[in-house]
Amino acid sequence: MNVILFGPPGAGKGTQAQYVVERFGIPQISTGDMLRAAVKNCTPLGLKAKEIMDAGGLVSDEIVLGIVADRLSCEDCGTGFVLDGFPRTIPQAEALIEILACLGKQTDHVISLEVSNDEITRRLSGRRTCPSCGKGFHVLFAPPRKAGVCDFCGADLVQRGDDHPESICNRLSVYEKQTSPLKAFYAQKGLLRAVDGSLPVEQIQLQIRKVLEGCSSDCA
C-alpha cells in the first residue's frame, strides 16, 4: 500500500501519518528525514546534498529524486510506505511515477487533510514552547497551570516566530500554491481523497482507514 499524505501546517499530518504507520506496518518517509539520513550516512547523493546545503543553496530535484528512489527501494518499503512532504511539484509527481514504475510499484492512495485557514491559525498561533526544557503547551488545548510559565521548570514560555498570524498566513499561502496543482493532478488520476482534518483525531483516523481499506460508510 503506497500512500501520499498532504496537509497544511497544523493539520495534524504527523499524527495521522504515524497512525498509518502503526495500523498498516509501513514506514513513514519524509524528504527532510531522507536528506538528513543520506547526509549522515555519507551516501554519494548525501554528500552532494551536504555540499549544496552548507553553501546555503537549495538541493536540486535531481538529487532529491535520487534520494527518494534510493529510499523507496529499501526492503522496509516492500509492502508499502506513506510519503509525507513529497512530491511538492508536478515535475516531482511525474518523476515519482517513473521511480515507482521502475520498482514495479504505483501510488495507491493520495489523502489530503482539509482544515480551514481559520482553524489552522487557531491551532498554530496558540502554541507555546519552553526555551529551557523544550516542553510544549497550547493556550487553548494544553495550557500551562500558570499563564506564560512552564509547568516543568518555571521558565517563561515563548511563541515560535513562524507561529505568529502573519507568518502562518504566508505559510498557508505557500502551501496552497504548491498543493493546488498537485491535488488537481492526482484528482484527474482518480487517486485523491479529501479527509476532514477538523474532526477529532479518532474520527479522522476512521476516515483514513475507510479510504485505505476500502471500507463502506459503516466501517467500524
From Swiss-Prot:
Q: Which residues of the sequence carry a binding annotation for ATP?
A: 10-15, 127, 199
Instruction: Write out the entry's keywords from A to Z.
Output: ATP-binding, Cytoplasm, Kinase, Metal-binding, Nucleotide biosynthesis, Nucleotide-binding, Transferase, Zinc
**Enzyme type, top EC level:** transferase
Which GO biological process categories is it annotated with? AMP salvage
Outline the segment boundaries, as ranges, of region: NMP. Answer: 30-59
Localization in the cell: Cytoplasm
The record lists the catalysed reaction(s) as: AMP + ATP = 2 ADP
Q: Where is this region: LID?
A: 126-163
Which Gene3D superfamilies does the protein's record reference?
A: P-loop containing nucleotide triphosphate hydrolases
Q: Where does Zn(2+) bind?
A: 130, 133, 150, 153
| GO molecular function annotation | adenylate kinase activity; ATP binding; zinc ion binding
Q: Which GO terms describe its cellular component?
A: cytoplasm
Any Pfam family from its record, for instance, is ADK_lid
Q: Which CDD domains match?
A: ADK
HAMAP family the UniProt entry points to:
Adenylate_kinase_Adk
Self-association or partners: how does it assemble? Answer: Monomer.
Any notes on this protein's domains? Answer: Consists of three domains, a large central CORE domain and two small peripheral domains, NMPbind and LID, which undergo movements during catalysis. The LID domain closes over the site of phosphoryl transfer upon ATP binding. Assembling and dissambling the active center during each catalytic cycle provides an effective means to prevent ATP hydrolysis. Some bacteria have evolved a zinc-coordinating structure that stabilizes the LID domain.
Q: What family is reported? A: Belongs to the adenylate kinase family.
The protein's name is Adenylate kinase
Tell me the organism. Pelobacter propionicus (strain DSM 2379 / NBRC 103807 / OttBd1)
Organism placement in taxonomy = Bacteria, Pseudomonadati, Thermodesulfobacteriota, Desulfuromonadia, Desulfuromonadales
Gene that this polypeptide is encoded by: adk
